Every structure is written in C-alpha cells, then in structure tokens.
Amino acid sequence: NKSGTVTAVKNGKAVITATVKEHPELSASCNITVMQGANALKKSVSQVMAETSAYMRAKDTNPSVGSEWFVLGLARGGLSLKERYFSTYYNHTANYIEENKGSLTNTTKYTEYSKRILVLTADGKDARNVGGDNLFKYISDRSLVKEQGLNGPIWALLALNCHPEYSFPKNSSAKGQNSEDALVNVLMQSELSGGGWALIGNNHDSDIKGMTLQGLATYSHQA
C-alpha cells in the first residue's frame, strides 16, 4: 500500500524491491518466504516460567557440583532463595571444595572457579567464604587465569564484578597478581583490527566477542 506495508496473500516465496521515490536509482531487494503464522501464546509468561522452574527442579532434585546452570537460571528466574534447592546446592558444593582441598579442575580451566563465584553469588552466598574458603584466591594469579585463553580473563572479570565488595586477595606466589585493571587491559589488548576478538588465531569469533563485551560492559562509560 501507499505507506509501504506489504501484506502476503498466500504461502510461498517472493521478492520484494524497495525504491526511493525521489531517487529511483536507489533500490534494494530481498527474498522472503511466507509461512503460516505461529499459534498465539495461550499461556502467560509467568505461567511458562513457573512450569519451566518446576520442570528443572524435577530434573535436578539433588543439586550439586555440575548443577550450576540450573541453579543460576532458577535464581535469576525469580525462585525464592529460601527454597531448599539452593541450600542443598551450596552445602554439596562447599563439601566438595573442602574434600578436594579447593580443587575444582585438574586442567587450566580456571573458569570453573569464576563460574562457581557467579552461581553462588546469585544463590545469595558470599563466594569469599564457601565453607571458609575464598574462591577468589584460586584466580588471583593472572598468569594461570590467562592459560585458558580469553575465556579465563573474561569470566574472572565477570566474577569480580558480580558483587561490589569482591576483590582479588594478595597472592605473593603469583607470577602476575590479578586485578580488575589488569583483566580489562588483557581484553582490550586482545582486540583484533576492525573491533573483534578470537578464541584462537586472528579470525573474528562472534561467540567470544559477545562474551568479551559482556566482561567489558561495566566499563562502557569509559569508552
């Protein structure tokens, strides 16, 4: 019609071309596929959220190490932190850390600590005192965190910024003392030409770029 709205009359494929009236030399075309519209949502968002929460808890009845994304999703989704689900996860995690003398990984995946910090904080707990253990001490050596590639610094920065009182404890044996500024510099210095980041090599990677921007989002006002 005259307002520029295009209405399909049947299913199928078509080509739509738009032209600027005053400048007919300016035009663009796109291919579209017309399909039957999806059914309208019959349930409210809150009802769907409640059903999803119930399903997750039914699938994960005894949350422990390995339940992190369930715990984070339920906590951020609004499930009361007073629910036994969260205390069960915390107790299992604290016991696991104590039994394994603080070890959450036997590789360079120090994101395991950052992930627990994020989840436990969402759970309403203080990651600096998990059964008496400060999880930040395990990611206080920047050189170790960097061994995992960009994911290490990204997740360490996310963990650090998930609570205003968090900080890295002094680590006298560290090859490089970790700090907020140091992590930001690592990410900024890893930026590729054209404004992107890569997990490996020099090819822009949309996934790692998205994660890097999440880590740097706190500092967007400084750009």
Functional labels for PLM-detected ranges:
Residues 1-40:
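Extracytoplasmic soluble-region selector
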Residues 35-223:
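Preference for long, amphipathic alpha-helical scaffolds in soluble/luminal domains
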